[in-house]
């Protein structure tokens, strides 16, 4: 995987979660978000994911074994717009 630029982090997170189908009741551990990204980007990815939670794009579900997250289905259209803009920009580059 090529290095992610800072502006690529948010769409990359949303795209990863959407591709895996982590919407509503299907969730994954917060710790799984940076997997597959370059090691030096993992801290930035976690910070961006926390901001996505605050912004309401990602829902959180606290459990006894850690924080679980999923995409907010109510913001599906916005999420796909962000992903599509990012993919079309990457295709042009």
Predicted regions and their residues:
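Short alpha-helical segments that sit at the start of domains
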Residues: 1-23
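Surface-exposed polar/charged interaction patches
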Residues: 20, 55, 86-89
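Short helix-coil junctions and helix-kink-helix linkers
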Residues: 30-43
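Short beta-strand-to-loop capping motifs
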Residues: 37, 71-73
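Short, hydrophobic-biased segments on the C-terminal half of alpha helices
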Residues: 46-50
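A short, conserved structural fragment
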Residues: 53-63
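Minor-groove-contacting beta-hairpin "wing" of winged helix-turn-helix DNA-binding domains
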Residues: 65-71
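Short, amphipathic alpha-helical interaction segments positioned at domain boundaries
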Residues: 74-93
């Amino acid at each position: 995987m090529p290095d992610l630029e800072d502006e690529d982090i948010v769409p990359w997170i949303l795209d990863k979660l959407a591709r895996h189908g982590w919407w509503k009741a299907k969730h994954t551990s917060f710790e799984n978000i940076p997997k597959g990204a370059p090691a030096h980007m993992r801290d930035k990815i976690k910070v961006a994911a926390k901001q996505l939670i605050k912004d309401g794009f990602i829902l959180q579900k606290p459990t006894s074994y850690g924080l679980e997250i999923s995409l907010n289905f109510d913001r599906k259209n916005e999420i796909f717009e962000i992903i599509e803009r990012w993919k079309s920009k990457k295709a042009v580059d």
